[in-house]
Structure formats: structure tokens, C-alpha cells
């Protein structure tokens, strides 16, 4: 995990830079064929989109090559400035931030951004795996689930997706363990 920390820090910083972009148009990747097939199952899938707005040149320069793979976006220094001022960067988000779903429905999280994200169910919202982003966002207590990530929990950009099933009636919380202000609350219904 220690060797992944610099890479994750880079990814986080790149994502923050993109969120602060002034770009008027964003090119979004198309969902994968598997995502389309799952979404076509009538009423069985609730879609959550993962957004960011990283500028590839400034994020890749600050964090490392390949951190940001989209075109245009927010410069890294602006991302850090906005995160420092507000504790979050609006372009880095899950949409919707809250939704209702039936027990047994599938939540399909699709990465429409240019950075790697996670879609991690947590008991309580908290910090993630990038200490600098935790500090700047005010999420200094790390969510334990973020410390137990597996390699396949990291969702690359380009329309890639992850699925999770609504297992019970009640509230389920999901966050990105790289950008911990990216969150959604799911209200499980019978």
C-alpha cells in the first residue's frame, strides 16, 4: 500500500485540477458494452456517474504521466486552490448525490472522468487513501473501508464501471477513496 500512495496522491491532485476548469464543453466517454447491457435490464439498475475535470498537462506534470486522460479541464493549481478554500471541488462528484433504490437493484457506477476513482461502500464517510486530499478536504479520519481496497476497486477513466447490489432496507453510503468528498447516499427500499 505504501508504494501506491504516491500514485494515488498524483491521481487525486490531477482530479482536483480538472474540477476547477472553465471549459464549457466536456467530452464524455461512452459507457462500455457491458454497462449498456446491464442498464437495459428493465428497472434493475440505478446509474451513478463519477465526474471530474482534470487538465491532463498540469495534472500529469504535478502527479505523474497518465494521471489524467481527458482533454481540457481545470489546471492542477486551481484544483488545489479550490479544494483548500472549499474542502471540495465541485466538478469532482458522484451524480446523483442521493437516490432511492429497491433491495436487489444493482448500483452501476460509471467513471466519466479522466482520473481513476473508487465507488466504495462505507459505514461512515471519511477520508481516503491520499493524505494531502484528506487534509485539504477536512476528512482527516480515514474511512476503514478505504484502507482495505483491492486492485479491482480502482475504476479507470473511459467509461469503465463498477457494480454493487442494494442489499437491505436502509441507508448505504458510497465514496471515492481517492477524492473523499465524492459521495452518494442510497436509500434502500423494500
Annotate each predicted stretch with a short phrase.
Residues 20-190:
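Extracytoplasmic copper-binding redox domains, predominantly the cupredoxin/blue-copper superfamily
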Residues 1-18:
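Sec-dependent bacterial lipoprotein signal peptides
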Amino acid at each position: 500500500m505504501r508504494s501506491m500512495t504516491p500514485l494515488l496522491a498524483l491521481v487525486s491532485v490531477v482530479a482536483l485540477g480538472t474540477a476547477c476548469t472553465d471549459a464549457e464543453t466536456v467530452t464524455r466517454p461512452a459507457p462500455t458494452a457491458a454497462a449498456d447491457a446491464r442498464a437495459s435490464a428493465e428497472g434493475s439498475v440505478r446509474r451513478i456517474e463519477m465526474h471530474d475535470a482534470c487538465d491532463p498537462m498540469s495534472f500529469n506534470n504535478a502527479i505523474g504521466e497518465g494521471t489524467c486522460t481527458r482533454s481540457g479541464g481545470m489546471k492542477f493549481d486551481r484544483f488545489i486552490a479550490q479544494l483548500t478554500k472549499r474542502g471540495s471541488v465541485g466538478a469532482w462528484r458522484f451524480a446523483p448525490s442521493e437516490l432511492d433504490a429497491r433491495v436487489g437493484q444493482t448500483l452501476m457506477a460509471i467513471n466519466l472522468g479522466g482520473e481513476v476513482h473508487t465507488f466504495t461502500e462505507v459505514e461512515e464517510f471519511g477520508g481516503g487513501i491520499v493524505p494531502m486530499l484528506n487534509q485539504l478536504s477536512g476528512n482527516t479520519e480515514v474511512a476503514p473501508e478505504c484502507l482495505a481496497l483491492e486492485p479491482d476497486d480502482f475504476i479507470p477513466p473511459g467509461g469503465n464501471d463498477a457494480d454493487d447490489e442494494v442489499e437491505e432496507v436502509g441507508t448505504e453510503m458510497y465514496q471515492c477513496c481517492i477524492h473523499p468528498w465524492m459521495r452518494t447516499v442510497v436509500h434502500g427500499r423494500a
